[in-house]
Each structure stands twice: as structure tokens, then as C-alpha cells.
Regions:
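Membrane-proximal helix-turn-helix segments that form the acceptor-binding/catalytic region
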Residues: 104-105, 147-165
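A short, well-ordered alpha-helix in the C-terminal region of glycosyltransferases
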Residues: 340, 347-361, 370-373, 377
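Acidic donor-binding loop of glycosyltransferase active sites
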Residues: 280-292, 305
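Conserved active-site histidine-acidic residue motif and adjacent donor-binding/catalytic loop
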Residues: 256, 264-279, 292-293
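A short, active-site helix/loop in glycosyltransferases that binds the activated sugar's phosphate group
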Residues: 121, 125, 144, 160-184
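Conserved acidic donor-binding segment of nucleotide-sugar-dependent glycosyltransferases
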Residues: 321-332, 340-345
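Conserved catalytic-core segment of nucleotide-activated headgroup transferases in glycan assembly
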Residues: 58, 75, 174-178, 187-262
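N-terminal pre-catalytic "stem/leader" segment of glycosyltransferase-like enzymes
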Residues: 2-110, 215-217, 232, 242-249, ...
Length: 382
């Protein structure tokens, strides 16, 4: 074994001990006794409060809308991030967020009426709080780990009796199917922020006249987003379309690391304004939602951009199949679909309108109200 491999393995082993030791030392893995006193002080525990995180931003949106409904919110860093840095990151993600930011070591176990875990490691840390224990689930995390310690510990978090509230129904069905759930489990609708991505009416007939097809492609350094497969598919598609007289302009966004193959424009991480401009400039938007759906297709649909998703993902769990192009792993299938809609722009417009109509009733305000309705149905203990 070379020195580099030894260093990587030693670092990974040390980091795992940091994660696992407090769990094994402090958790007895018994089902929690979960009693709610009816109060409105909510603590939300995150590993870190970081910039440019969709998951963190969703938590801030939920918390802010709960604050508007009369709840007192505190966002807590499990790893004791600097308070000033937390506030800066929160403002970066959501400039008008409401609530307080604190490191875990500045909280006490009696500070809250409700304590909410947001990631598998945070579940074990909220056990010390004298509060109603909830688990806000944005994805089924065991999927991300190979079978072993991390997989087992993450899977166990759904079996400890916390009140689970999922962002969307897919997580609920997956957790129930995969785990021995002991506590209450509910979900709120997967929303989007309407004020940031307004619908722009397009002249779809123009696409029939153009020989250049522009696509906005979401890539991220996470396997569930297919950061290697998507560029490879598009590389073959680009070469094939060129033989048919079409130029494919690929605009990658969301990536911090270089794309695996040089076949497009690497936009990196974009602001919301830049994203909306990109969506308006492109003819199609492409994203992979293999586990719980990404927020990105909602944004694209809201802006009026036709969406390309994957048959093997969860898009059709949230939307009808008639609202997007669902491709497989073959560039030939994707090419056939794109050329069909280029030749039939009226159908592309109808698909886009159908997709947009399906999200009109969604909002963070509505989802926050659903969260409150869930709390209203919990039996309270004085």
C-alpha cells in the first residue's frame, strides 16, 4: 500500500471515530419517549450552516416561514461553527431569513420546546435535549453509504421514535419500506420560492428555425446527480447532433470542481439572478434526481424552461410523465426526444405549460402551514 493511500485511510478512520464515538458512548438506541408541551420555541440542529447549500437554504426557508407563523427559531451548528460565520452564511443563502444562529455549545437542554434533527448525525445529538424530538428529512441518507457502519447508523435514525417530517412523500415511502419506523411519520409538500423564478413566455416556434440548441445542465459533486455520466452522455450527443447539422451548447452550472470532460461552458455556482437568466437563455434544462427530487427542476419549470430528467430517478414520483423529457442512459434516446420536440415546438410548449401548472399551488408558506398542522395534531403533555 502506497503512502498516499495510507494517509487517506488513516484520515478517514480518524474522522469516523470523531463521528461515531459520541454516538456509541451516549446513545443507548432505545425508542425515545416523545412528549410535546405545545410550546413554540424550535431549535433546528444542522452539522454546519454553510453557504450555497440547497439543503441548508430549505431549512432556512422553512424556519423563516415558521417564524412568521409565531414560532421562535434557532439554527444550531452541531460542530460549533462561529456565530458570526453562521449569520453570514444564513444571509448569503436567504437574505431575509428569520431566527437566531448559535453553536451547539451555547445552548442548554431545556432551551426549546421542539428540537429538530436535519441530518443523520444530528439525530444522535438531539437526544440530550428535553424537548419534543423531530427529524426533518430531505433525503434517505443510507443510500449514500456503502453497507457498513455509516449505513447502519444512518438507517437507525429512522427507527428511534422521533417524529419524522419529510420534504415530499418519496422519503416517507422509502423510509417505511426500508426501516422499522417506531414514531410518527408525516410529510409536507416539496415547494419552491415563487418570487425568485418567474415564468417567462417563450416563442417556441423559433427553436424549429435554429441550428443551435442550448442546454443548461445541473451538475454537482454528488453521485446522485450523475456528475460523470451526464457529461459523457452529452459528449456523445453533441458529436451526433453535429453530424446532423446541429450545434449543442452545453452550459454546466452548480459545479465547484472541473467537469470530467471538456465539452461545454463551466459556469460554476451561480446566483439566483444568474440562474434565472441562464434558464431564460437556454432551450432545455437537464438535471438528475435519483433520490429525493432536486429543487432545480422546480426552478426550471417555474422559469418556463423545458426539463430533461431521468427515467431511473424520482421525477415522475412528483410530476406526471407528460411534464418533462425523461431520458435513459443512452444519448440516442435523448437525441431522438430533443429532435422530436425541435420539430414539434407546439408540443414542447404544451409540455412546459403542463409542468408549470402543476407547481402553481406550491409555496414555502403553504408547506410551513402544513408543518404547523402536523404539530397541531400532536397530543400535548403539560
Amino acid at each position: 500500500m502506497d503512502l498516499g493511500t495510507k494517509i487517506i485511510q488513516k484520515t478517514r478512520y480518524r474522522n469516523n471515530i470523531i463521528d461515531y464515538k459520541p454516538i456509541i458512548d451516549n446513545c443507548d438506541f432505545d425508542i425515545v419517549e416523545n412528549n410535546y408541551n405545545g410550546g413554540k420555541k424550535i431549535g433546528i440542529l444542522l452539522p454546519h450552516l454553510v453557504k450555497s447549500s440547497g439543503g441548508v437554504t430549505s431549512i432556512l426557508r422553512l424556519g423563516t416561514n415558521l417564524s412568521k407563523l409565531g414560532y421562535q427559531l434557532t439554527y444550531i451548528s452541531m460542530f460549533n461553527d462561529n456565530e458570526k460565520d453562521m449569520v453570514e452564511a444564513a444571509k448569503f443563502n436567504l437574505s431575509n431569513y428569520e431566527g437566531e444562529c448559535l453553536p451547539l455549545n451555547k445552548t442548554n437542554k431545556n432551551d426549546f420546546d421542539i428540537i429538530v434533527a436535519t441530518e443523520w448525525r444530528t439525530v444522535y445529538r438531539i437526544m440530550d435535549f428535553d424537548a419534543y424530538k423531530m427529524y426533518f428529512v430531505q433525503d434517505f441518507e443510507p443510500i449514500f453509504f456503502e453497507m457498513g457502519e455509516r449505513y447502519l447508523l444512518s438507517k437507525k435514525t429512522y427507527e428511534l421514535g422521533l417524529h419524522i417530517v419529510s420534504l415530499g412523500k418519496w422519503n416517507v415511502d422509502t423510509v417505511v419500506k426500508s426501516c422499522d419506523v417506531k414514531g410518527q411519520i408525516d410529510y409536507i409538500e416539496f415547494p419552491y420560492e415563487k418570487t425568485e423564478y418567474t415564468f417567462v413566455k417563450r416563442n417556441f416556434e423559433k427553436i424549429k428555425e435554429k441550428r443551435k440548441i442550448k442546454v443548461a445542465v445541473y451538475v454537482k459533486e454528488e453521485s446522485k446527480r450523475l456528475p460523470v455520466i451526464i457529461p459523457l452522455i452529452l459528449d456523445n450527443l453533441k458529436k451526433s447532433l453535429k453530424l446532423k447539422g446541429f450545434e449543442l451548447e452545453i452550459n454546466y452550472f452548480g459545479n465547484a470542481l472541473p467537469i470530467c470532460i471538456n465539452n461545454g461552458i463551466e459556469c460554476g455556482k451561480l446566483s439566483k439572478k444568474q440562474l434565472h437568466e441562464l434558464y431564460c437563455e437556454c432551450d432545455f434544462g437537464m438535471v438528475a434526481s435519483l433520490t429525493n427530487i432536486s429543487l432545480v427542476p422546480y426552478e426550471m419549470i417555474a422559469a418556463g424552461l423545458p426539463v430533461i430528467e431521468f427515467k431511473d430517478g424520482t421525477f415522475d414520483y412528483f410530476f406526471s410523465k407528460e411534464t418533462a423529457i425523461l431520458c435513459d442512459l443512452s444519448y440516442k434516446h435523448l437525441e431522438k426526444e430533443i429532435l422530436y420536440y425541435v420539430e414539434n415546438p407546439a408540443e414542447l410548449e404544451e409540455m412546459t405549460i403542463r409542468a408549470n401548472k402543476s407547481i402553481l399551488s406550491l409555496s414555502w408558506e403553504k408547506s410551513a402551514n402544513q408543518f404547523v398542522e402536523i404539530l397541531d395534531h400532536v397530543d400535548t403533555v403539560e
